[in-house]
């Protein structure tokens, strides 16, 4: 999840901790079930003294704002009283049929808080923005609750790292790679997101028994253990 601080006086964006936000979102990523026409995201104003406006919109995979498209967010702007909770509805349009139906499509959901105008002079007001990944998952590839498809990933040992193969129709975000479960969870690693049916090379030491951590649909961070046969490594299946 990305949170950006926006200075209302046109000062450039920069990343901050989400703990500073007044308007919060109930998740760090969203999966839109293609068998449904809509879904809702819960939002809340965690400030108990001041009302805030909440502005919502969708971006495409290139992080370009889309006014009309396969998925829209409503209402685009709403007022949240102090301590109040509300929701944003994501709905599909007829353009949804133009998306591939055999793999996921990537969008971004944005939520920006707009603080009330200060009555004091020379006060710089600050707005915070939350951005999360929004995956549209067509009905044809609908998954079961808690289904693990990430265990289809393949690691190929190459010079200076691994080439990760993602043969699935889903996006996979890899956040760790190491020679132990702890190293995969806590070691330094540059996060990569693999598109459906793609491969990507990452820098890493080579391990006899690699471990890989990823982000699942719920924001959890499970770890997979691999078994290698030569330079090719596949996930160790639980019996």
From Swiss-Prot:
Signal peptide: 1-21
The organism's place on the tree of life at top rank: Bacteria
Any Pfam family: PapD_N
Keyword terms, alphabetized: Chaperone, Disulfide bond, Fimbrium biogenesis, Immunoglobulin domain, Periplasm, Signal
Membrane-crossing residue ranges in chain numbering: none
Record's GO cellular component terms: outer membrane-bounded periplasmic space
Localisation: Periplasm
Disulphide-bridged cysteine pairs: 228-233
GO biological process: cell wall organization; chaperone-mediated protein folding
Note: PapD donates its G1 beta strand to complete the Ig fold of PapK (donor strand complementation).
Biological role: Binds and caps interactive surfaces on P pilus subunits to prevent them from participating in non-productive interactions. Facilitates the import of P pilus subunits into the periplasm, probably also facilitates their folding. Chaperone-subunit complexes are then targeted to the PapC outer membrane usher where the chaperone must uncap from the subunits. Coexpression of this chaperone with individual, otherwise toxic, P pilus subunits (tested with PapA, PapE and PapG) suppresses their growth inhibitory phenotype.
Family: Belongs to the periplasmic pilus chaperone family.
Assembly notes: Interacts with substrates PapG and PapK.
PANTHER family per record: FIMBRIAL CHAPARONE PROTEIN (PTHR30251:SF5), PILUS ASSEMBLY CHAPERONE (PTHR30251)
Protein's UniProt name: Chaperone protein PapD
Source organism: Escherichia coli
